[in-house]
Amino acid sequence: MLTLLGFGMVITFMTLIMLKRVSPLVALIAIPILFAVLAGVGGDELGKMMLEGIRTLAPTGVMLMFAILYFGIMIDAGLFDPVVNRILRSVGNDPAKVVFGTAVLAALVSLDGDGSTTYMITVASILPLYRRLRMDALNLTCVTILASGVMNLTPWGGPLARAATALHVDPAEVFVPMIPVMVIGVAGVLVLAYVLGVRERRRLGKAALGVPPLAADAPRDSHQAQEVDTALLPANGESEAAASLRRPRLRWFNAALTVALIVGLVVGLLPLPVLFMVAFAIAIVANYPQLPEQRARIAAHAGNVIAVVALIFAAGVFTGILTGSGMVKSMSDSLLTIVPPSWAPSLATITAIASMPFTFFVSNDAFYYGVLPIVTEVARNAGIDPVEMARASLIGQPVHLLSPLVASTYLLVGLAGVEFGDHQRFTLAWAIGICLLMLVAALAFGLFPLSAG
C-alpha cells in the first residue's frame, strides 16, 4: 500500500509540474499532505514529519538566502565591472576572441547562481559586437548556456541545492569535491568557444571584419533584432540608478572579501550558512552604510530570495512526509526486486548518464525531489553514499538548460534574437559532450564510483 501511494505521489507531483497545472511551491506542499492522509497519517504525527523535514533543510534555506543577497550586493557594487570591461576591450573584431570572451563573461557572471541575470548581463554586454561583425548569435547562446550550466553547480545554484535538499546531505560535501570537475567543465566550454569562434572567423572571412552591419546581414528577423536591441538599452533613469550603486573605491575590498569567502567555503572554516551570513553583513555595511540604502538593496533582491527559499522549505514538507511515512523505504524495497543485481553497484554512473535525458524531459523539481531519493535508497543498499548520488545527479545540467521546461532559456534566445529550436539543434550535441567530459572527470577524481564494491 505504501509503495503504491509513494509512487502515486511522485507521479502526481511530476505530472502536475510538467503540465504546469500548479506551481512547484504548491505541489511540494499540497500533494504529500494529500497522500499522507490517504496513507492514514494525520494530526500530530503528520505535523511532526513536516516539521522534521523543514528543520533538516533550514540550514540550506539560510545559506541560499544570504548567498543570493551577497552576490546581489557584489553585482550592485560593480565588483565584476572591470573584468567585463576588460573582456569587451580585449576581444576586438576577431570572432574567435569574441566567442571566447562570451564564454569567459558568462562563466564569471554565473557565479551569482541566477540564469536570468547571467543571460541579461552577457547578452546586453556583447550582443552589439555580434551585430557589428555579422556573427551568428547561436554561438553566443550556445557558449553562454553551457557556461551557465557548469557554473550553476555552486551551492547557491538551484540544482545542487535541490539535490542536497532531497537527499538531506550537506551542500558543502557535495560541492567542494565538484570544484575540479567544474574547472574542467569550464575549460571544455572555453575550448569549444574558441573552436566555434575560429569556425565563425572562417565563415565570415577577413573582409567582413570591422564592417558595420547591413540590414541584409542582420539577424534572421530584423524587426525582432530591432526590438531586442531596444530592450537591451536601459532607460536613463535606470542607468543612473545603477551607476549610483557602484562602489569603485571598494572594489579591492569586495574582491578580497569574496576570495576569503570562497577559501573559507573550501577549507570548511565555518558552516556554509554562517559564512554567507557573515560575508553578507560585512558587504552590505561596507558598501551601503546608510540604513535606507541597506533596506533598498535587500528589497531589490527579495524577489529572488523568496522564490528560492520558499521552494526549499516547501521541499522540506515533501521529503519529510516521503521519509517519515515510510514511503521512500517501501518504494526502494520494491525497486530492489526490479533492478537487476548487476546494475545496483553502477547506479551512480547510471544516474549521471540518465540525468541528461531525465532533466531534459522533466523539471529539476520533479527529478530531484521525485526520482533521485528513490534511486538513492536503492543505491545505498549497494554501498553507494547519498553524497555520491547527489554529485552524480548534477552531471546532466548543461543538457537540462536546453529543455523547453526552463523558462530562463526563453529569455536568452529572446534577447539574442534566435529561434528556440535553432538554439537546441545547434547546442545539444555540444552540451552532451560537456556532460560526458564532466562525467569522465568526476570518475577520475573519485566523486562517485564507476561500480561500487
List the predicted regions and their residue ranges.
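Re-entrant/interfacial helical elements at transmembrane boundaries that shape
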Residues: P82-N85, T117-L129, G157-L167, S330-M331, ...
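Hydrophobic alpha-helical transmembrane segments of multi-pass integral membrane proteins
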Residues: M65-F66, N93-S125, I338-E377, N381-A382, ...
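Transmembrane alpha-helix interface/packing and boundary motifs in multi-pass membrane proteins
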Residues: M14-R21, F71, L105-D114, I145-M151, ...
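Hydrophobic mid-bilayer segments of alpha-helices in multi-pass membrane transport proteins
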Residues: T3-M14, R21-V41, G61-A67, R251-I262, ...
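Membrane-core helix-loop-helix motifs of multi-pass transport proteins
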Residues: P128-D217, D385, I395, S408-F445, ...
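Membrane-interfacial loop-to-helix junctions in multi-pass transporters
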Residues: M1-L4, R55-G61, I87-G101, R132-L140, ...
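Core transmembrane alpha-helical segments of multi-pass membrane transporters/permeases
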Residues: V26, M49-D81, A107, P273-V274, ...
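Long, contiguous bundles of hydrophobic transmembrane helices that form the permeation core
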Residues: L4, V176, P180-R297, L450-G453
